[in-house]
Amino acid sequence: MGETLLTVQNLSAWYSEEKMILSGFSFSLAEHEVAGLIGLNGAGKTTFLKVISGLLPTFRSDGICFCGTPVDFRKQDFKLCRYTVFAEDNSFSYFTFREYLAYVCAAYRKSMPDASELVHGFHFEEYTDILLRELSTGNRKKAFLITAFALKPRLLLLDEPVNGL
């Protein structure tokens, strides 16, 4: 394994003070390591991903480090290092796949990659110029996964990545 990529110590997260979703969750991930979170519905897997993605501000932790440096999930420099594909995503419904990929690359300050091998590997050739809202759940998921893999972020977070495929 490589260097430690992400360390989260004693993370607690909630949507309301009365309902704690995560309590005392610790996690460490090495560079190039693949890890999966397994748990019952409502166990907090998606909540954990929302915290790391900077989408859930109601959390506390004893320490969060990215590549050995303390990090704030909501800061721009960390956002540019990670990409998240959520289980259900109806964002960017008026974009085609090509437009979405170009938009994401611009947001991440990366040049437009050649995603043709990924498009071919996902059997997605005929869908690249169709609005995301017109795609099936599975093909919309493919569009987001192709974008994620083409972007090559240091930290890739996938919530139920094979649902709908």
Feature locations, PLM:
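Conserved ABC transporter NBD signature motif
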Residues: T58-F78
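Conserved ABC ATPase "signature" region
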Residues: M112-T128
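Catalytic Walker B motif of ABC-type/P-loop ATPase nucleotide-binding domains
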Residues: L156-E160
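Hydrophobic anchor residue at the start of the ABC signature
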Residues: L145
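The feature captures the beta-strand-to-loop junction immediately N-terminal to the Walker
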Residues: I38-L40
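Helix-to-loop junction immediately C-terminal to a conserved catalytic motif
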Residues: S53
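ABC ATPase C-loop
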Residues: F149-A150
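A short, flexible loop at the N-terminus of ABC-type nucleotide-binding domains that lies
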Residues: M1-E31
